[in-house]
Regions:
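Acidic/aromatic-lined carbohydrate-recognition and catalytic surfaces
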Residues: 2-214
Length: 214
């Protein structure tokens, strides 16, 4: 992020990835810790905040070998905001806290993915309770971000085939046979919707932070 840029002035900047900031359970999230960080940058008159890609990582935790150029890593989801905005039931807060406390003494990619999956399941539990306005915003977002359907289908297929490389998948999926893909989408509506919901919330939270910084 570059704040109030003027080419005739000197600027200072800092490189810090959001995952390195405090907050969240397994790494920094798009929550209050980032807002606090932006406030500190402003107080110190640091104009530029540079960070590494926010995309989902590979099995080794690298964002440079990501399954998507557009998607955001689910690890960054801010649960507190989801609860506050009624996207997750308040009653689930204790459940999330218990899971975090039990599993997150040290950082593990597998555990981080498991908790992201749990958050996705909780979002699905509350989906039918969302207002028409919120569902409409989600649908409009999906229409304006056509990549998210292909990404969601791809990720459900990747899980089906034990996260193997796509070129090792059955022929009908490897070459994106239209009828095979349509059948897959029809039979996997909920898993695909869950991934879309996660990406929508990530994008929504990130844009709020960007606006706050600007």
């Amino acid at each position: 992020m570059l704040l109030n840029f003027d080419p005739l002035k000197k600027y200072s900047g800092i490189l810090v990835h959001p995952s390195s900031l405090p907050g969240g359970s397994y790494c920094g999230t798009f929550g209050n810790s980032i807002r606090d960080w932006i406030e500190i940058l402003s107080i110190c008159k640091i104009n530029t905040w540079q960070f590494l890609p926010l995309s989902p990582t590979d099995s080794m935790g690298s964002p440079y070998s990501s399954p998507s150029s557009f998607a955001i890593n689910p690890w960054f989801l801010d649960v507190d905001e989801l609860i506050k905005s009624n996207y997750i039931k308040q009653s689930h807060q204790a459940k999330i806290f218990q899971l975090e406390s039990a599993k997150l003494n040290i950082f593990q990619f597998k555990v981080a993915d498991e908790l992201s999956e749990i958050i996705g399941n909780l979002l699905m539990d509350s989906w039918h309770l969302l207002s028409f306005d919120k569902k409409d915003k989600f649908n409009v977002w999906c229409e304006n971000n056509s990549w998210v359907n292909d990404f969601s289908v791809f990720m459900t297929l990747k899980e089906k085939f034990d996260f193997s490389a796509w070129w090792n998948w059955p022929e009908e999926f490897k070459y994106k046979n239209k009828y095979a893909i349509e059948k897959w989408e029809k039979n996997n509506v909920k898993p695909i919707l869950k991934i879309k919901l996660i990406q929508w919330h990530l994008d929504r939270q990130w844009l709020k932070l960007k606006k706050f910084a600007e």
